[in-house]
Amino acid sequence: KHYETVLQVLCFQDYETYDFKHPEDQSLSGFSWENLHKDVKSWTCEDFKQNLHHPEATNAFEKDFRAMHEADYCVLLLPCGRSAHSEAGWMKGQGKKVFILDLSEHPTPELMYQMYDMYDTRLIDLVKHIEDSYNEDKMLLKEKINTYGQNSKETD
C-alpha cells in the first residue's frame, strides 16, 4: 500500500534504493510463486520443498540476496511478510542498520523489534533517522581514516 510512496521519497532524497518489484535486470522482475504453479495455496510442505530450489526461485533469491549484501541500511516497511522479516533479521545480523517504518493502522506488537535501530511511524522521521545514521557513519569513517594516517598531510 505504501511501498511506492516510501520508495519515491527515499529516491527523492538521493538514496540509492533496491526496488525488488522493478529491479534493474528486468529478466528477474516480478517473481511470484504463482509463476511456478497456479494454486500455491493448495501446496503441501512437500510441494513447497520441491519448488523451493526451482531455477526461477533460485534466480530471484540470488538477486535479492546480492542486493542485501550491497545495502548499507534496511527499511522494514510494515505491514509485511515473512520474507521481509527474514531479510531484516539477516541484515541486522550482518551489523547493518535496520529501520522499521510502521504505517499500519493497528500495529502488531513484536518484542523482537527491539533489536532494530529505530521504529518509526512517520515517513519524515524515517528519513531523518537515515540521514542521521548516514552522517554518523561518515564521521566514523573519517575518524578511522585519520586514525590510520591515510588522510594526513604526512602521506602526501
Can you annotate each of these PLM segments?
Residues 1-156:
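Conserved catalytic or regulatory cores that recognize and/or transform ribose-phosphate-containing ligands
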